[in-house]
């Protein structure tokens, strides 16, 4: 019997998340999808458990791991947060190892994915993906559309590196098992680089199959203070 059948799906009211300014996006560049002729090595997926007890202080997950170790959280909440730390680390490495199978597994079929393209004026090359009068264009993508484009990005780049900082876990105030995770992300590939704020809405109600319902990204240059960073309270969940 499929245990997920007893879990009610999360419905996200999409008309509440798109803002007039400072739109959340997933950063992608049009020219980043052009093929790279370098041969790609196949990589085996390896889901692992991070030992939070031995985590170094410079690890981006250290502050949140310390809350779990302190023993002041409810047992179920602590277990969920421990799982989030493991899954977020594997999510990060799934981009660097081009593990499209893992991404296909964790994104909900109804995931809200807002895709952004950084459009630069001719002759400009910003180090962080947005600069001066550069613009970001936006469009909604289905899971299928997003992963198909991501496969093109993986094929076009020999190396992709993703680093996290300012990692925070937010528990939904009324829906058990629903968590928001925000972090600052630095993305670097052969053809493109950017820095911005990433938000992920995780559903851990079925522990055998955690799902991502939302992923958003905001260019760092467009955020003036912490209040403008997308968080769990920016979504109406039903």
Model-predicted segments: where are they?
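Low-complexity, intrinsically disordered terminal/linker segments enriched in charged
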Residues: 15, 23, 42-44, 53, ...
